Amino acid sequence: VTAELALALPVLLAVTAGLAWLLAVAVGQIRTLDAARETARALARGDDAAAALALGEQVAPPGTRLSISRSGDRVVVRARGRIRGPGGLFGAIPGATLRADAVALTEPGADGPREADR
């Protein structure tokens, strides 16, 4: 039993580390989507573009870029980021790209946002 455990334990640790990294990627993707949504909602309400971007950056993972564009009465927010690979034994695995887009209709009476990038 000891020899089998000695062989299985490193495999279990590697699988656990890989699953933890996949969970981190999933959480990063959710945060990226939330950042795009929060920014789009704020702009649809008529908030200033700088304030809306600041709100989105509070939610986004570090290093995420938010960009705003407007098409008629629609506000489009794109969030792009990257999460590092797991490193260590998994050094060959590249990082993951995080992407999210959110579209919102400008509310009646709200000033439209200006083009902005951050």
List where the protein language model places each region.
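Short, conserved structural patches
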Residues: 45, 49-118
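Alpha-helical assembly-interface signal, strongest on the long, hydrophobic N-terminal helix that forms
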Residues: 1-52
